[in-house]
A protein has these predicted regions:
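Residue-level signal for well-ordered alpha-helical scaffold segments within enzymatic catalytic domains
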Residues: 2, 54, 97-100
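Short loop/edge segments at beta-strand edges and connector loops
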Residues: 12, 39-41, 109
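Rossmann-fold NAD(P) dinucleotide-binding segment
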Residues: 1-13
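A contiguous active-site-proximal alpha/beta segment in oxidoreductase catalytic domains
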Residues: 17-80, 87, 94
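Residues at helix-coil transition
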Residues: 5, 57, 102-103
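Short, intrinsically disordered, charge-balanced linker/junction segments flanking boundaries
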Residues: 2, 60-61, 107-109
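Rossmann-like dinucleotide-binding domain that binds NAD(P)(H)
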Residues: 77-109
Length: 109
């Protein structure tokens, strides 16, 4: 919030906060100050995602009717074996990639 108050645009890591109220305050402040406030969701910039997006834009893969995505972390690693680790660490990337290729979500099954 110091950077926003100083007039800076902000690119941050996820999660923007461990507290929903605090996160919303940051988003609201950025809107009030007309500053960009973005979360670095870098999976859309991987080589595979870039190629797939090019194919999509060039019409090589047709219309997407359904999207499904799974991410995982390799072998067991004790520091990753914490409550909700996968949810916090990977699901934001899944949601971003799904929206990158499919647009805003209309329906969830």
């Amino acid at each position: 919030m110091q950077a926003l108050n100083a007039g800076c645009h902000v690119l941050t890591e996820k999660p923007i906060s461990n507290n929903l109220k605090h996160g919303q305050e940051m988003v609201d402040l950025a809107k009030k100050l007309d500053r960009c406030f973005a979360v670095d969701l870098n999976h859309r910039f991987t080589p595979a995602a870039r190629v797939a997006k090019k194919w999509q834009n060039d019409g090589l893969i047709g219309d997407l009717l359904f999207l499904n995505m799974a991410l995982w972390i390799g072998r067991f690693q004790p520091h990753f074996d914490t409550e909700f680790y996968h949810l916090k660490a990977l699901n934001p990337h899944s949601c971003d990639i799904l929206r990158y290729f499919g647009g805003d979500v209309d329906q969830v099954h």
